[in-house]
Amino acid sequence: MAAQLNVEQLEVSLDGLTLSPDSEERPGAEGAPLQTPPSSPPRDGLGSGTAGQQREPGEAAAEGAAEEARRMEQHWGFGLEELYGLALRFYKIKDGKAFHPTYEEKLKFVALHKQVLLGPYNPDTSPEVGFFDVLGNDRRREWAALGNMSKEDAMVEFVKLLNKCCPLLSAYVASHRIEKEEEEKRRKAEEERRQREEEERERLQKEEEKRKREEEDRLRREEEERRRIEEERLRLEQQKQQIMAALNSQTAVQFQQYAAQQYPGNYEQQQILIRQLQEQHYQQYMQQLYQVQLAQQQAALQKQQEVVVAGASLPASTKVNTAGASDPLPVNGQAKTHTENPEKVLEPEAAEEALENGPKDSLPVIAAPSMWTRPQIKDFKEKIRQDADSVITVRRGEVVTVRVPTHEEGSYLFWEFATDSYDIGFGVYFEWTDSPNAAVSVHVSESSDDEEEEEEENVTCEEKAKKNVNKPLLDEIVPVYRRDCHEEVYAGSHQYPGRGVYLLKFDNSYSLWRSKSVYYRVYYTR
């Protein structure tokens, strides 16, 4: 009869699952135990899902399904849904290749798959199946036999049935688990690497910002320092111009006359020489000013130390009009202007008269000298040699004094000198005496401070006082210092403080073996 179809010869694909009945059942298919992993105990009350088995919904069933899902996840290493997806993929790939399920097993797989996708069978929503559709009727009957089985139970039964039919599922899932673990390791390693890179970028960014801030601070400090230095330079330059203008106004006439004598008719050379003289005059003035300031500081410090040592008490008696080491020096640049010689100590009668009648009129203020150098030493000595009286020999241990009286028509004294091969001491003094002789004279003396002190030891105070009264007063214009006049010409000028005699001292007392030849010239200007 046509209705009697050999069902075992049919092969139908339903919902992606192939149903191919096998005439020969696999050995051990009937009643074979479910092949689950040894570490996972079998679920109580959940068999192979035979047809007609119905599960009543309830709290106990739900708890049992959840517990079974946890056990499977612990053993297989995947969640239930992920494990079901792997099992379904394995079934589609390996069906008919790695394993050959029976017709009933295929019906069971299809029914469980439908239960997972659509839930329990509902005849109202399912399409009608023809009377002769044997496979459709078997499939619907198997699906209906599952009853109200939950989705989780259906997935569990599907995995168990597939594991029973094909033990290779365990290896398949294990390989995916290993792959998943490796992927997780790679993901964690990548995440750690990105985190380290992010931390490194943040660190480098912070270091770069710190370096930029430090660089900006350094540039700002350098800019402030450059601005401060430039302002200081401009201030000093302005101060220098003001001082030079004041000094040049005082020496303009002398320098112009001196330059006219050196380069007559050559205006350009005269201006060059005047600028050189003005610059040297400024340098000399600043040096003297610094020396005065330093001497004031040292004197103040020494006085403070003396006060600390001696206490608050001061000496009861002091000498009258005696110049001491701690006397304040002038601060207007006119160093050594009023330096008094020890020869100017007042005698007792003069001191008493000064105390009774008050001080006499002071001497005129002495202007500071101007001194400079110029390198034309060879030409200077050649010119001076033409006048034999302008070349003098200062023997060893001697001091030669050139006395130059002031001239009635003069206002300034100029001097120039040089030596052959060695330096010599030089200084200028002004003697307050009215000399009837206007001629220049040269005096030689064997100066020795020790000899003068020995001679003074044998002189009584009365004789010393009379001797000092007879001596004219002296003012030091230029202190005696050794000058390198064998290398360049030393020159200078000084404004007359009044009528008197200039004493130009060439001191060779420090030399024990050598005599010095001095080439000098003195003249006055109005």
UniProtKB/Swiss-Prot annotation:
The modification N-acetylalanine is found at residue 2. Residues 13-68, 180-226, 318-343, 444-464 are annotated as: Disordered. Residues 80-171 form the ACB domain. Keywords: Acetylation, Coiled coil, Golgi apparatus, Lipid biosynthesis, Lipid metabolism, Membrane, Mitochondrion, Phosphoprotein, Steroid biosynthesis. The keyword Mitochondrion applies. One of its GO terms (biological process) is steroid biosynthetic process. It comes from the Eukaryota. SUPFAM superfamilies: Acyl-CoA binding protein, Supernatant protein factor (SPF), C-terminal domain. Residues 238-305 are annotated as: Interaction with PI4KB. It is a peripheral membrane protein. Residues 447-460 have a biased composition (Acidic residues). Residues 381-524 form the GOLD domain. The modification Phosphothreonine is found at residue 18. Interacts with the C-terminal cytoplasmic domain of giantin/GOLGB1. Interacts with PBR and PKA regulatory subunit RI-alpha. Does not interact with PKA regulatory subunit RI-beta nor PKA regulatory subunit RII-alpha. Interacts with PI4KB, TBC1D22A and TBC1D22B; interactions with PI4KB and with TBC1D22A and TBC1D22B are mutually exclusive. Interacts with C10ORF76 and RAB11B. PANTHER family: GOLGI RESIDENT PROTEIN GCP60, LD35087P. This is Golgi resident protein GCP60. It comes from Rattus norvegicus (Rat). The gene is Acbd3.
